[in-house]
Swiss-Prot record:
It comes from Mus musculus (Mouse). PANTHER family: SMALL INTEGRAL MEMBRANE PROTEIN 30. This is Small integral membrane protein 30. One of its GO terms (cellular component) is mitochondrial membrane. Residues 1-24 form the signal peptide. Interacts (via transmembrane domain) with antiviral protein MAVS (via transmembrane domain); the interaction disrupts MAVS interaction with RIGI and inhibits MAVS aggregation, resulting in the repression of type I interferon signaling and innate immune responses.
Length: 59
């Protein structure tokens, strides 16, 4: 049981060390993430549209 408590303490300590890095996310990072998601979805839809047109013989 002692090793489990030691592992738990190590995990909690590592999470506390990582936490300030997570808090450093700013509004610019959030905007960049949302823009990336929107552009990725748009690109996927464009590729699906091209595939559908080729499959139907319209291109």
């Amino acid at each position: 049981m002692n090793s489990v408590s030691t592992q738990l303490i190590l995990v909690l300590a590592s999470l506390l060390l990582i936490l300030p890095v997570v808090e450093a996310v700013e509004a610019g990072d959030a905007i960049a993430l949302l823009l990336g998601v929107v552009l990725s979805i748009t690109g996927i839809c464009a590729c699906l549209g091209i595939y559908a047109r080729k499959r139907n013989g319209q291109m």
